[in-house]
Amino acid sequence: MSDNSKTRVVVGMSGGVDSSVTALLLKEQGYDVIGIFMKNWDDTDENGVCTATEDYKDVVAVADQIGIPYYSVNFEKEYWDRVFEYFLAEYRAGRTPNPDVMCNKEIKFKAFLDYAITLGADYVATGHYARVARDEDGTVHMLRGVDNGKDQTYFLSQLSQEQLQKTMFPLGHLEKPEVRRLAEEAGLSTAKKKDSTGICFIGEKNFKNFLSNYLPAQPGRMMTVDGRDMGEHAGLMYYTIGQRGGLGIGGQHGGDNAPWFVVGKDLSKNILYVGQGFYHDSLMSTSLEASQVHFTREMPEEFTLECTAKFRYRQPDSKVTVHVKGEKTEVIFAEPQRAITPGQAVVFYDGEECLGGGLIDNAYRDGQVCQYI
């Protein structure tokens, strides 16, 4: 049996049940564990309570209980520069970003990893539902978490081989109810704490109100694809491709009573296009173009790959053919896909393994670009 006590693991602790159990398991396995609370955002909730302060209290309680040292580190500047500025720039460009993907790439597995190494870390660990498998030659493969409903490899798809080499995911083989049970059995103060939802820096706040603090809203016309004026939209940044709610036109209908969806955007003319029907023609595409495509292990500069892909979190896999050529990557779908959204991540899988992914630039319908920006 190996002596884990000589291996230092620095755990990113958020004050939630997942990272609490991560630290607990590593401590029980004999590792030299240090807990780190990352303060990435200066935040207060609707009641004026600083949520980070409350979360840090939970980290302190759990760390004291399981007997590990803990520190708090402030990454607010890094977060603003590397994640939030990107988030705003994407919305300005008419896209719908995924800040969680960028937060993992730039903060949790870069700024945090760099900091952990200064503490003598051999590995970092987080409460993500994912797994790593190590080959004899040292190559690390990232695998889906066993809990299919909680698998978070979609958000980890931009991690590099170097980052994965230094990473442990102790919860990857567990299902969420087991994690809660372990926390309760150990009497952890976070055992019944509610899971956080929403984008980390928005939390439960109203998204529209939050975004308007940073980007001025520019109302414009809402049109059908055949030119019918449906009224005013509040600003293109508030709508995403395929969105149903919040259009304010539910009572208006054409030939039937089918619900209305966002089916396109024209940033240059500030027009929001809407159409009726979940599978409206304008929502369907046959391929996409992606950039910032990255694989978790070394690949040739140009290659073609048959695999599956996800275009949003918790979506079933779809069969695709991936053509990687220089800066741009083309992804061709075996079956037409609905609401492929510029700015979101496309993530590639080979069975259980997450191969990597990129950011969606454009969707295409039979070679013609879909007007989604």
From Swiss-Prot:
Binding residues annotated for ATP, in chain numbering: G12, M13, S14, G15, G16, V17, D18, S19, M38, G127
Cellular compartments annotated: Cytoplasm
Statement: the UniProt record of this protein carries the keyword Protein biosynthesis: no
Catalytic activity, as annotated: S-sulfanyl-L-cysteinyl-[protein] + uridine(34) in tRNA + AH2 + ATP = 2-thiouridine(34) in tRNA + L-cysteinyl-[protein] + A + AMP + diphosphate + H(+)
Annotated segments matching region Interaction with target base in tRNA: 98-100
Keyword Hydrolase: no
Organism domain of life: Bacteria
Location of region: Interaction with tRNA: 150-152, 244-253, 312-313
GO MF annotations, alphabetized: ATP binding; tRNA binding; tRNA-uridine 2-sulfurtransferase activity
Cysteine disulfide links: C103-C200
One Pfam assignment: tRNA_Me_trans_C
NCBIfam families: PRK00143.1, trmU
UniProt-recorded name of the protein: tRNA-specific 2-thiouridylase MnmA
Native species: Streptococcus pneumoniae serotype 4 (strain ATCC BAA-334 / TIGR4)
Gene behind the chain: mnmA
